[in-house]
């Protein structure tokens, strides 16, 4: 990756899009060292329960294309209004969002051994061209599907 098509942020997309009242469909593309592992796009459901990503999720809308250090139910992504959100599900190795707009990294949920006792980690909005790092070995590129 690293091409113009895959590194653009919300500023570029905003210049191409007309105002909308419906959130775009998003999908996840698994990557490895910045390159696509396979070209399979995992669509995210618009169902209010969302999509659960992990090694053994219990939901019908799930993504299991993850590395060995992803938890059974690692991350949930859902649509609320016109915005997509991600929230950690108490994973062992945590999740970090790398902003596609160049806004830096946001810790969605730190690894279990670094969490503050009793702290609730709120949902984080995700957008086209963001990257989600689940633990050390699983990265997804967020794309308009």
Question: What do these predicted ranges mean?
Answer:
Residues 61-62, 74-131:
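Forkhead-associated
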Residues 1-68, 117, 121, 125-131, ...:
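Intrinsically disordered, low-complexity acidic Ser/Thr-rich regulatory segments
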């Amino acid at each position: 990756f690293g091409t113009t098509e895959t590194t653009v942020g919300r500023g570029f997309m905003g210049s191409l899009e007309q105002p909308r009242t419906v959130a775009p469909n998003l999908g996840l593309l698994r990557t490895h060292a910045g390159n696509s592992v396979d070209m399979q796009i995992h669509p995210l459901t618009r169902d209010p329960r969302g999509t659960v990503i992990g090694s053994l999720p219990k939901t019908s809308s799930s993504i299991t294309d993850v590395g060995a250090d992803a938890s059974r139910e690692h991350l949930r992504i859902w649509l609320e209004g016109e915005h997509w959100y991600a929230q950690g599900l108490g994973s062992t190795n945590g999740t970090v969002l790398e902003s596609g707009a160049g806004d830096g990294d946001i810790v969605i949920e730190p690894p279990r051994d670094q969490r503050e006792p009793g702290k609730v980690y709120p949902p984080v909005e995700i957008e086209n061209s963001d990257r989600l790092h689940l633990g050390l070995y699983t990265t997804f590129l967020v794309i308009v599907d």
